Structure formats: structure tokens, C-alpha cells
Amino acid sequence: MDTDTPHALLSIRERIKAAHNRFGAPPAEVQLIAVSKTFGREAMVPYLEAGQRLFGENRVQEAQEKWPELRARFPDIELHLIGPLQSNKARDAVALFDVIQTVDRDRIAEALASEMRRVGRSLPCFVQVNIGAEEQKAGVAPSEAVSFGQRCRDEHGLNIVGLMCIPPDGAPPGPFFAHLAQLAREAEAPLLSMGMSGDFETAIAMGATHVRVG
């Protein structure tokens, strides 16, 4: 996230629009999620004043310290959890976030579903796919993504709307994004959260609906 806030946001939005127009692929619009981890509360204000409303946070505790006060001033903020979630943080996550992008195992799915039932919320959720099958990364195996997503719906009652991935560092991202798009079609999960600062234009070419830029 750049210190020259309005210019940085405008530049990214223009690149997103240009990529979308160039490739002519669905969806109708690509959503920019500004990755705000490590930035303090007041550092967010210029982005909010410049019109940015979608933000991604990696840690529940950090988000708790930052966003409640900002939400009182900017009530239309949409907050996405894009980092790993522990089951003992499910209650806090459901209370604070609007979208959960990192559902990757049954224990988390059940913890989220249980808390949503308790408070009467139904948050949109993404299945996180370990698209490169990397040992150090979270996410379900690509071969299990479709069945896991269906299980999240049928057994846990989650509202699975899409898939999310982070491709391997140093590898051309296009084939991984294409693979995620194919899995999303099979899973009947129309939203695709893929693409970050260095590769979001490639992700848009493959059908990304959400890009995460920080």
C-alpha cells in the first residue's frame, strides 16, 4: 500500500480496468481487496477517504484492534479474512469479518458454521486451495477442493461462494490460476480470489473476481 494514497489507488484501479477490458473475460467487475495487514488504524483513513471499502486482513487479533473504530466512521467497509484461521478464533472472526476466504479443513468449517448459527449470520466463504500442493502452505489439495466445498455446504451449512489461492513463488502463475478457475466451475463456486500485487493482471485474464493487492 503506497503512501501516495489517491494516486496509488487510482493507478491500481486503472490497471485492473485495463486488464479486464483487454482480456474481455468474466466477471462483469473485478473487486480490489486492499491488503491492510501491518498498517495501523489511522493509516487506513486516507484509503477510506479515497473511496476504498474492501480490505483484507491476515490476523483476527490485529483486525480487532484496527477496524471496529473505523467501521463506526465508515459503516460500509467490507472486511475479508485472507489469513489462516484457528478454530478458537471463529467466534471473533464471525463477529468482525464480512467474508471468510480461508476455509480449508472440516474443523474450521464446523467452528464457523456453529458460530454463524449461534449469532444468526451467514457469511460468504471461500475454500482456500493449496493450488501448488506446497507443504508449507495452507489450503485443501486441488484434488479435494470440489468435494470439500460440497461437504462444507451439505454437512456444515456454509455459504461457499468461491475459491481462493496463492500460487507458488517463482513459478508462472497463469496455469495455477487456470486450474483454480476450472475447479471453481466444477464446484459451482463462481467467485475467484486470486492474484496479488505482482500477478493480478494475469489472474484477471483467467477470470478473477477479487484481487488482493497490498
Task: Please annotate each region the language model reported.
Residues 1-198, 204-206:
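Conserved alpha/beta-domain cores
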